[in-house]
């Protein structure tokens, strides 16, 4: 059907933004802002020097035979007591798979590598990326050449004792790192030999389910680690519960452990026993971010005061006298009446 459209009149200087009923500002949904690979302030461009990859304040030394971090340094503090290990344990013992980490891409915003090794049983590949804010992602693919009986596939992160002072996640509330701990994906296991551990006890009271991630460290250096899957990256809200990544969860066999040993805190994510069938790949996906992600301004802990009142975002005189300097602006109020429709009345935000 032939169709012709004739548009008359002069273009609006503000594209119709002054008339809210047009919802013209929804064009921000098509914005390309933020998808550039250029680091935003205060971040800096990525650096690569031999086996070291760097971002703002942090450096990762790659263990060439495994492609995993051999050492992680945050703001001049070394985090690891020894290299991170991804272990495949069969009935014949731990696999000694060694390859070489190849640089596949380097831009201002990220550095990517690939790694591959194989033996008579398995082909193992890994794709890794580190981004300018210190986020790292490792995706392992295990392809069996034949049926393989596996006792465990696990990730071990050995953190220096002086760094691993505090722990949050994997079923634990924020606390001093316990001497030892054993937890599962969906239900914390309290044991008599684990005194002094603060556990989440109710799915209604705590938004910690599922126990898919943790942070360990102190104010100066630390690691957050998240265990992911091909269609799973952990819910940001507790309104929905996607299926766990079967590689790590393994029908409930997977879990977490903490052990304080001489000079280190060993954090382990294990998946338990399984049968790997020939030519059927399985993926193990995990991400880490090195903390702090930016320089810490400790003085702001004493000078910045926040105000949050969703329906009434205007602080009163007594609030200002108390030192309020920053207002958290929620939606559905006189200044921000529509969710996902940013600052339609920004001229009223001068208090």
Label the predicted regions.
Residues 2-6:
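C-terminal edge beta-strand
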């Amino acid at each position: 059907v032939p169709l012709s459209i004739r548009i008359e009149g002069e273009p609006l200087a503000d594209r119709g933004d002054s008339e809210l009923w047009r919802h013209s500002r929804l064009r921000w949904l098509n914005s390309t802002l933020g998808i550039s690979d250029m680091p935003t302030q205060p971040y800096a461009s990525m650096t690569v020097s031999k086996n070291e990859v760097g971002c703002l304040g942090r450096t990762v030394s790659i263990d060439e035979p495994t492609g995993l971090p051999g050492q992680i340094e945050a703001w001049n503090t070394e985090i690891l007591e020894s290299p991170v290990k991804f272990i495949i344990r069969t009935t014949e013992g731990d696999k000694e798979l060694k390859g070489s980490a190849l640089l596949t891409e380097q831009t201002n915003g990220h550095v990517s590598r690939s790694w591959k090794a194989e033996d008579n049983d398995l082909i193992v590949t890994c794709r890794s990326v580190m981004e300018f804010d210190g986020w790292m992602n490792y995706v392992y693919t295990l392809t069996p050449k034949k049926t393989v009986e596996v006792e465990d596939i696990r990730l071990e992160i050995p953190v220096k004792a002086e760094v691993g002072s505090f722990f949050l996640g994997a079923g634990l509330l924020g606390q001093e790192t316990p001497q030892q701990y054993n937890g599962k994906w969906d239900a914390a296991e309290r044991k008599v030999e684990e005194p002094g551990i603060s556990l989440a006890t109710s799915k209604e009271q705590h938004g910690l389910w599922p126990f898919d991630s943790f942070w360990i460290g102190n104010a100066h250096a630390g690691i957050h680690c998240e265990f992911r899957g091909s269609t799973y990256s952990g819910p940001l809200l507790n309104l929905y519960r996607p299926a766990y990544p079967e590689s790590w969860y393994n029908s409930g066999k997977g879990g977490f452990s903490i052990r304080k040993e001489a000079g280190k805190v060993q954090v382990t994510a294990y998946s338990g026993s399984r049968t790997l069938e020939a030519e059927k790949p399985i993926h193990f996906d995990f991400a880490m971010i090195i903390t702090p992600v930016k320089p810490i301004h400790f003085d702001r802990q004493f000078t910045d005061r926040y105000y949050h009142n969703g329906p009434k975002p205007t602080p009163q005189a007594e609030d200002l006298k108390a030192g309020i300097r920053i207002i958290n602006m929620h939606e559905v109020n006189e200044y921000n009446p529509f969710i996902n429709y940013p600052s339609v009345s920004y001229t009223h935000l001068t208090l």
